[in-house]
């Protein structure tokens, strides 16, 4: 499945434009992580693009979340590597390879970085790791972001938090125009 088909599938399932923007931003971060790890950015990008495809339908039902989306992806002919990583996003037992472990900190750091971008006049342009690190310590900033998933990146994928921030910023900048995060 190429990206245009994948975006069309996402748009057919997502009920909110905010969901689509979230999926595209996580896609950008996953593509950047793939390049860093010498993996296929198209595969990793699709994992990011699809990871919350059922978010608007499952409405926080953690048992169904990702399982509904996995069913849609299988029906659309998406490969099991991608489907497994989508399941891994919400169900730990599926975290069996690097891409399925990477989606967890990638999702969390993307949400955090988007929050950082939204409070800056320049939005995603020119974000600095040091500023993000400082904001991470502020519990009142982006309180919905699971900071443990960000801090756990060293154990899960072998990256320090600063490195995850740096790669995440690059990934976010790569899709900033598409998701409205430019000044």
Residue ranges and their predicted role:
Residues 1-61:
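Acidic/His-rich, divalent-metal-binding segments that scaffold phosphate/diphosphate chemistry
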Residues 7, 11, 24-27, 31, ...:
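Predominant activation on well-ordered alpha-helical scaffold segments within soluble catalytic domains
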Residues 11, 31, 35, 74, ...:
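Short polybasic/polar patches that bind polyanions
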Residues 14, 124, 129-131, 136-183:
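C-terminal binding/interaction regions
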Residues 16, 99-102, 162:
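Amphipathic, non-membrane alpha-helical segments in soluble helical-bundle scaffolds
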Residues 37-139, 151:
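Divalent metal-dependent catalytic cores for phosphoryl transfer on phosphate-bearing substrates
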